[in-house]
Structures are given as C-alpha cells and as structure tokens.
C-alpha cells in the first residue's frame, strides 16, 4: 500500500505529472502548453451518447478482503459483473448519466481469448461509433497489476477525506517506433491532462502520473480516448468505490 511510479521519466507541472517512456529526442510533453489547448469536444448532450465505456480485460478483478496478503489460490479475475470491471463501469456510467451526459456502457467479455482482447474490443468500439456517431470519448476501464520480483503486490492508495481510495492512472499512447497509424495521438494526451487536472482539483493525490508510451490500445479510434486503470489487483472493491472517485469524470 504505497505510492508507485515505475520506470520512465517523470515530467510534472504543479500537481500534474506524466511518466514518459518515450525518448525526449522524439517528443517531450510540455504539460503547461498542452493544457492551454482546448480538447476537441462538443457540449455534452444527454439525448445522444457522448461517452462509450468498455472493457478490453473485462474479467479483471480485485482482492475481495483487505487482509494484507494473498495466496496462490487467490482468484484475481472474475466472470461476475458485480466483482469485475463491469461493476466499475456501471458506477461510472450511472454517475455520468446523473450529470446529464449521454453514455453507453458495453458489458461484453472481451478477454475469453486474452491475447486477442484488444482486437475483440476494437470491433465492439467500431460498432458503437458507427451506430452512435455522437460518441466523442471512449474509456477502456481496467485495473492495474503491479507485482515486485519478490511477489509483493502493490496497491497504490490515496487518503481522501480520511479514508483509503484506490489511485487511478490514465494510459496515453503515441505513434512511435512500432506503433503506426495513430496521427491524432496528441489530441488524446491533451484531453487526458484536462481530465487529470480536474480530478486533482477535487481529490488531490488520487491520480497517478499519466503513463505515456508507445501503445495504441484502440485509442486511435477517437480524439478523446484513454485507458483508465482503477487501482490494482491488490486493492479492494471498497477502495475503488469509496468517494465514488470516478465521479470526478463527470465534472
């Protein structure tokens, strides 16, 4: 239960941070400059879906008991929609709807064939974008897995209003090296920083640095796409639902 940064170069501006795994010779994010540029978004309309929530790794789950340890038999995946990523997506969806934002939540299990999960979810996203051209934001909701070489699991935790809450991390990608056909990646990074800034205003310390690396993860499909890691498999359902930390998305 700690703050975890991982590798890469940490770039910061105020309370905002990016953990960049991209060589500075290719691109060095200027957080201040990116924040000055407006995200490519329309005004939210409750009558039409603006946001798509989905899960490439749908069966990712959490530690059910905060016992401080786990065993080889601990099951950190679940087919139950009340214990896997669908539960997180349901709560996020409900709140955004209360904020007057049109949302579609896809509850499809995409990781029955784990190695093909992103290919499966890409087809799902493409279908929704065709059906609902009004969708501008896609959020692939996951939970992270941080395990040290000695098998110790990390559960990044913040203390918000005196209670523990699972920290969240946005993953942003770019067109670099092996990643091709991702021309609008900087729009995503701009949007990601705006989201991180809003969350940090309301719940300081809740967000981990944005992980910026040579990844696509279907984020090339809209200009406002990101992958969101809500806690890790070391966190408990109580820690990610406390304060409904995801509610900051609606604001």
Question: Where are the regions that the model predicts?
Answer:
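Active-site-proximal helix/loop segments of hydrolytic enzymes
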Residues: 118-126, 130-137, 143-236
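Catalytic-loop motifs flanking and including active-site residues across diverse enzymes
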Residues: 88, 191, 195, 243
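Conserved small/polar residues in nucleotide/adenosyl-binding loops
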Residues: 241-250
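N-terminal catalytic or cofactor-binding beta/alpha core of small enzyme domains
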Residues: 1-134, 145-150
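Short, glycine/charged-enriched secondary-structure capping and boundary segments
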Residues: 67-68, 152-156, 243
